[in-house]
Amino acid sequence: MKQDYVRFFEQPRNPLPGGILFEALRPYRNIILAVNPRVTIEVIEGILKACKDTGQIVIMELALSEMSLKGGYTGLTPSSFAERVKHAAEKVGWYGYVLHADHMTVKKGDEDELKNLERELDARIEAGFTSFAIDSSFLFNREAHSVEDQLKDIIENSIYLHKYIMDKLNDFPYGREGEVGEIGIKEFTEVAEALHYVRELKKSGIDIHFLAIANGTKHGVSVDSEGNIVPQLGINIKRTVEIADALQAEGFRTRIVQHGITGTPLHLIAEKFPKGRILKGNVGTFWMLLVWDILRIFEPELYWKINHWVIENYRKGDELEVETFNKYSKYAIKHFFNEFEKISEETKLAIKSKAYAEALTFFKAFGMEETAKKVYKYIQENKIKY
């Protein structure tokens, strides 16, 4: 006999509000998997099936660069991505997912950019997104000498855009994510920077659930001369814990979101990552590389078309072809969009199966246990409808 929470998330429903997920998981003891499924619906289906079979909630997300009103580099708009995830949920019979707008990035902070971001946010709200990340970390002022001045533009733009969302969604319990340290830079976010950022947003009535910091990881992967992924071991766990503990000591419930997990050995995550302090783990490039690996075996003609297109358009100087491909193949997704829709049923099954198995491994390494059951319990106890 099925448990109540299973029946609940098997029933067609809207994406789970991110704020409900954040509240329901207290006390925090795990990391929630957040997936950027850039290529093919089968990746989403495989992951959702793994969620259904193990009772998990997952976050499905794409960044502004990946998905936009113009299609980003995946060819997906906010509405088409939302529909893709919904269609996968219908096929699998599992609606335990948050729909997250990742990296709504501010690079200049001028009027034109902010107006465009408002249009992009409107599109995501209309498409039913239930969580939003404002990333103005590029505006860090390296010429300034005080934390207040260094973060001034970051904070002002974060507040402006978070308030824009709040005005649109009112009391809807959406997820809120901020970013104080640009992912991939050499400097580590200071404890004082994280505290100042969260304090200032709080003063403006914005409680951030997740905070992204610069702690030594980067987006994507690095490869050696043979094309093997070089393990990413640069995360500064000590600084991450210091920031999380400092936030908690001041009474903030904000937890860390870890970007740039692809390339980090899963055993390191399982054994060393401070679960609960890091509450959200973003995995994007990993799933794209998974699809390339399957295509190389099951659809070699398509794989080599993609490979040659990437090398021809993006290789610089004597850069290794494998390095060029790993770095720039994401730009092939939009170019070959229609061809991904024509892959064989055998290939689709392979992608789903591989995504399913890998998702199970991430769940285990992240310490995820019965997250759907916990969320269901919270929803029932608080008589929440969404």
Q: How does the language model describe each region?
A:
Residues 142-154, 223, 227-229, 291-308, ...:
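C-terminal helical cap(s) of enzyme catalytic domains, especially alpha/beta-barrels
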Residues 27-32, 247-256:
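Short, surface-exposed connector motifs at secondary-structure boundaries
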Residues 2-15, 29-94, 99-102:
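Metallocofactor- and cofactor-centric catalytic cores in central/energy metabolism, strongly enriched
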Residues 30-41, 72, 100-117, 184-189, ...:
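Active-site mouth loops of central-metabolism enzymes
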Residues 135-143, 205, 217, 275-295:
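Glycine-rich phosphate-binding active-site loops on the catalytic face of alpha/beta enzymes
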